[in-house]
Amino acid sequence: MPFTLGQRWISDTESELGLGTVVALDARMVTLLFPAIGENRLYSRNDSPITRVMFNPGDTITSHEGWQLHVDKVNEENGLLSYTGTRLDTQEANVTLREVLLDSKLVFSKPQDRLFAGQIDRMDRFALRYRARKFQSEQYRMPWSGLRGQRTSLIPHQLHIAHDVGRRHAPRVLLADEVGLGKTIEAGMILHQQLLSGAAERVLIVVPETLQHQWLVEMLRRFNLRFSLFDDERYAEAQHDAYNPFETEQLVICSLDFVRRSKQRLEHLCDAEWDLMVVDEAHHLVWSEEAPSREYQAIEQLAERVPGILLLTATPEQLGMESHFARLRLLDPNRFHDFEQFVEEQQNYRPVADAVALLLAGNKLSDSELNTLGDLIGEQDIEPLLQAANSDREDAQAARQELISMLMDRHGTSRVLFRNTRNGVKGFPKRELHTIRLPLPTQYQTAIKVSGIMGARKTAEERARDMLYPEQIYQEFEGDTGTWWNFDPRVEWLMGYLTSHRSQKVLVICAKAATALQLEQVLREREGIRAAVFHEGMSIIERDRAAAWFAEEDTGAQVLLCSEIGSEGRNFQFASNLVMFDLPFNPDLLEQRIGRLDRIGQAHDIQIHVPYLEKTAQSVLVRWYHEGLDAFEHTCPTGRTVYDSVHDELINYLAAPESIDGFDDLIKSCRQQHDALKAQLEQGRDRLLEIHSNGGEKAQALAESIEEQDDDTSLIAFSMNLFDIVGINQDDRGENLIVLTPSDHMLVPDFPGLPEDGCTITFERDVALSREDAQFITWEHPLIRNGLDLILSGDTGSSTISLLKNKALPVGTLLLELIYVVEAQAPKQLQLNRFLPATPVRMLLDKNGNNLAAQVEFESFNRQLSAVNRHTGSKLVNAVQQDVHAILQQGEAQIAKAAQGLIDAARNEADEKLTAELSRLEALKAVNPNIRDDELAAIESNRQQVMDALAQAGWRLDALRLIVVTHQ
């Protein structure tokens, strides 16, 4: 095409330069000025990587003054174009805009504009864009969206609770599972779902001070949620950045003590507009009607302002009725306002529980039992169901399940309280105790005597704590020259045990970090035993590396030496041998130690080894834990209660372990108290609530569906394709591990979620569970979600040209592959993606407007095509521009009809589901006061907004590919 001064051109290779203007010409060269950046570029007149910018009728263009023109007509005179049409800001008709006056910052965003402007993408990017659209749309439609991305085992009861609660509007619930059943994971799964769907954006987690780091690590490692820890120092720093320091972060963890200590801080927290608050160890919030504690009042203030609340607490039976009521009162003070009334109500639910027990037993029901069931579900005609349930027909079991479901909906606290017990959940291992009695070395005997004389003024509790760790007493006297490990028989025993069990992984826990470090040195130097260390002085990354080394099967560490605090929140269930080098001071810590291995999903019975020194506090405590509480071989929900009741007596025995007269009687009375409490707890179990919390067959089916999704290889293929195109290096390390590192030629300089020094990833859930240094890649992982956003939010792959070598078709035959997107714009919290995610509609049109997409599948067709370089592609486009316009018009006529069909289907689905949920809850509210008015109002409002948003849904062209047939 001949050049003329004033013409507008665009660079094929540097589209960010904007529109260029021809400002100089000679026989061989042309100079373009790019006003957007104020630079000139010199190009050859022949075969340069630049494309003439020509708009068409129907386009909207912008002048250099900023006003826009809808083009009706294009005129060419002396090689220069002028556009005539309607000015959009004044609606003035027949306005003419010369091309030299076009806005130089013009960006071509529509796929067809990019194609005509010569901005042609690589073919593989077009394919990636379509796959990204397709996969993203499919994932949003999955019923378990938000439940697959966490690094956890697929445990049915956890998935059931998260699925139920995570989909509610501003859920306010109490999670009261027994220890080891994963309350933290349930809370994390609910958070993950709510954040992913947009139902929540700001989250506050309030925990005891000792658990802050555990939660921080757990949220990051398991759910890829980056929380910020607020303490005094961080709070003071943030005050420089904002009036309310808590508004500087979306996801915050802080301690209960931090919340309680300052009135101003509590006010700032209350004003920070959180969507969801999690309170861990909520049973420590002390309440009575006359005198609620300051901690309780602080959380109560927050609970009045925060819409969604998750309280994590011990089981109701452990707490006692009044304490349990206090937790429920935080969730819904209008519903739970009178303790006496609450007690009476709970007693009234006994017939409901008895009725469920009858149905579960499967025996024939008597007339009186049938009448009881009829009375309990009185507002509905259930006669046919009762008859079916009491018959020998095939549908008898289904009828019983339906009746149980109806009873549970009507049960007092089943919507606000979830509680699972080990008895009701399968999959726990046995625990076997091996005690190893060892002689007390003379060096320790001497140190203990001297310590007794010098520490005469110490309290009994201080002496008891000292006596538990004789190596510390010895070291204090000997200083740096003390080498307790040379004579301590526990060290000899440990070395012997490890060398005779070299093929087994062993977790060793001791109270102090110094002990763990000294043991590592001894094991390494004396026996060459590979030992990793894990303590509170290490950073999270260092702990991850130690845990990963321990997890490696062949070349990894045989033993992991943990301090008490350092092991909080970490689970090592791939190991089943636990050595307690010393014993913790209270039963809760003992259970926490065993809980590192005793998790649901543990494949082997747990072997607990306790080497202890005779005539020391250790020998007293090992007997009290085992004989008095049965705390080694079974979980001990009574431990804290019994410990508190005999605290002073027990401390005296620990402080003076050589005087144990009467200790047998103490053990006997503790065991009696333990057995009585345990029987009481068992009797108080609410089996109806357990059935509801457990989820039954539905929960099992949910776990199986997600497991099936885990086995789908399409994610791996898509991810590798994405990483290739983005420019991320991939190094296969074997064992289903891949190392990703940034390259020098990335699509963007910093890929969100990819650290500068790279990261290790795996697509296997089992590998991710044993290798905490490896990120678990699912469709919900930030790397994939950020990758999808990167591709789909920009114009990557939105216009391309390919050649189709096919001798059955005439040379020069044109096909246009169009990817339309049908979507609705609405706030994220409406969760429109449940009904109408951005849905791609593919068309493959020939010159006559025939759509061949149904006959020609995308992937197989894509493999038959070959790429065209950008310069040749621009020439091809210019040659067939009018034909492409004609095909596009035919595509628009066809997509309008197809889009309306999708929109109507989405509206019908939304109306059906949301109306059914609202009707169900309104009907139940008549018999179950735990259904909140604000929840019903929110569902009604949400339904109306969803229907309105779907009515406004539309379509747009997202990508196109021009295909030209060749025989070469």
UniProtKB/Swiss-Prot annotation:
Gene3D superfamilies reported for this sequence: 2.30.30.140, 2.30.30.930, 3.30.360.80, 6.10.140.1500, 6.10.140.2230, P-loop containing nucleotide triphosphate hydrolases (3.40.50.300), Tandem AAA-ATPase domain (3.40.50.10810)
Protein name listed in UniProt: RNA polymerase-associated protein RapA
UniProt keyword terms in alphabetical order: Activator, ATP-binding, DNA-binding, Helicase, Hydrolase, Nucleotide-binding, Transcription, Transcription regulation
EC top class, as a word: hydrolase
Molecular function in Gene Ontology: ATP binding; DNA binding; helicase activity; hydrolase activity, acting on acid anhydrides
GO BP: regulation of DNA-templated transcription
Residues spanned by motif DEAH box: 280-283
SUPFAM superfamilies the record matches: P-loop containing nucleoside triphosphate hydrolases (SSF52540)
Superkingdom to which the source organism belongs: Bacteria
Binding partners and assembly: Interacts with the RNAP. Has a higher affinity for the core RNAP than for the holoenzyme. Its ATPase activity is stimulated by binding to RNAP.
Recorded family membership: Belongs to the SNF2/RAD54 helicase family. RapA subfamily.
Pfam families registered for this protein in UniProt: Helicase_C, RapA_C, SNF2-rel_dom, Tudor_1_RapA, Tudor_RapA
Functional note: Transcription regulator that activates transcription by stimulating RNA polymerase (RNAP) recycling in case of stress conditions such as supercoiled DNA or high salt concentrations. Probably acts by releasing the RNAP, when it is trapped or immobilized on tightly supercoiled DNA. Does not activate transcription on linear DNA. Probably not involved in DNA repair.
Binding, ATP: D177, E178, V179, G180, L181, G182, K183, T184
InterPro entries: Helicase_ATP-bd, Helicase_C-like, Helicase_RapA, P-loop_NTPase, RapA_C, SNF2-like_sf, SNF2/RAD54-like_C, SNF2_N
Lineage: Bacteria, Pseudomonadati, Pseudomonadota, Gammaproteobacteria, Enterobacterales
Helicase C-terminal domain span: 490-644
Domain Helicase ATP-binding, residue spans: 164-334
EC number, as in UniProt: 3.6.4.-
